[in-house]
Structure formats: structure tokens, C-alpha cells
């Protein structure tokens, strides 16, 4: 019994006074990463940006995109919009894990891409709040971009553009 007590006291002292110091933390000290549940749950959400509204369903699959019945590269030929839409999957390391089915209407191409990204982020958040929410929120993908076109004012050519003024 006394020998067991000596071993435990030595183990405790060894933990308190390490023999070597490093600037890197060990794998055991790193923040515990929660296990992701099996990819069997689907999620659905709505995303909006400017005048565009996207109704998005994210279903476990092979990474197939269907937007208004068309493929991603067909609907958004601009690579920048394709990357923008795919960002929530990239940041969560879930590329190719889910199929995306979306119906988008209203607005222009940029607004539709932003609406789709928000809808995807919200549906991924719905699927697994514990693991996904903090990452998506930190990246800013769960926030709705409230910027909209400013209305035209009476007596002006546009929202703020007035006729040229001549002092003399």
C-alpha cells in the first residue's frame, strides 16, 4: 500500500514539474475535437441578400449541386461566385459530403450567390450546431448582409447624385 502511494505521489510531482519544456502543446493538451455525427441528417434553410432569396436543402451525398435545375458551374459561370458559395463547406472540411438543392429567385448574380452561401451555412448549422456553429459564426457566414440599394430621392438624379451646381 505504501509503495502505491509513493508511485502516485511521484506521478503527481512529475506532472507538476516536467523535465523538459517546449513551446508547443502536446496532442493531449489540444482542445478536444468533438466527433461529428454520421452524415445522415439533412438540413434546410433560407438565405437572403439584396433582393435575392435562396431556399436551400443540404442532403448527405456526393457533392452534387442543383440550382434551379442546373449545375453549379452552369448557373454561376464566374469562378469567384462558385468559390463564394462553396466556402461554408471548405471551412468545415465537408467538401463533397453533401448534395445541395436550391431554388433561387430575385436579384442579380452576386446577390443570389450571397443568398445561397447564407442558406448553405444556415442549413449546415442546423445539421450539427455543436460542431459547426462556432466555426461558421467566426467566419461570418451566419450573418445576413443587410446592405440594400438606397432609394432614389426626389429632385436628385439617383440616390445621392444631384445636378451640377454653378455658383456664378
Curated annotation (Swiss-Prot):
GO BP terms in the entry: translation
Region (Disordered): 1-36
Pfam families xref list: Ribosomal_S9 (PF00380)
Biased composition (Low complexity): 1-11
Family: Belongs to the universal ribosomal protein uS9 family.
Family annotation (NCBIfam families): PRK00132.1
The protein's name in its UniProt record: Small ribosomal subunit protein uS9
Organism: Pseudarthrobacter chlorophenolicus (strain ATCC 700700 / DSM 12829 / CIP 107037 / JCM 12360 / KCTC 9906 / NCIMB 13794 / A6) (Arthrobacter chlorophenolicus)
Taxonomic path: Bacteria, Bacillati, Actinomycetota, Actinomycetes, Micrococcales
Amino acid at each position: 500500500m505504501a509503495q502505491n502511494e509513493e508511485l502516485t505521489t511521484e506521478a503527481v510531482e512529475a506532472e507538476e514539474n516536467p523535465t523538459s519544456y517546449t513551446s508547443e502543446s502536446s496532442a493531449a493538451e489540444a482542445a478536444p475535437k468533438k466527433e461529428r455525427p454520421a452524415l445522415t441528417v439533412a438540413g434546410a434553410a433560407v438565405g437572403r441578400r439584396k433582393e435575392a432569396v435562396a431556399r436551400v436543402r443540404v442532403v448527405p451525398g456526393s457533392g452534387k449541386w442543383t440550382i434551379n435545375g442546373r449545375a453549379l458551374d452552369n448557373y454561376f459561370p464566374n469562378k469567384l461566385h462558385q468559390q463564394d458559395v462553396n466556402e461554408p463547406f471548405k471551412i468545415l472540411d465537408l467538401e463533397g459530403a453533401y448534395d445541395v438543392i436550391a431554388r433561387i429567385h430575385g436579384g442579380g448574380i452576386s446577390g443570389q450567390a450571397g443568398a445561397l452561401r447564407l442558406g448553405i451555412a444556415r442549413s449546415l448549422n442546423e445539421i450539427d450546431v455543436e460542431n459547426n456553429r462556432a466555426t461558421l459564426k467566426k467566419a461570418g457566414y451566419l450573418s445576413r448582409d443587410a446592405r440594400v440599394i438606397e432609394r432614389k430621392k426626389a429632385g436628385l438624379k439617383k440616390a445621392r447624385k444631384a445636378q451640377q451646381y454653378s455658383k456664378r
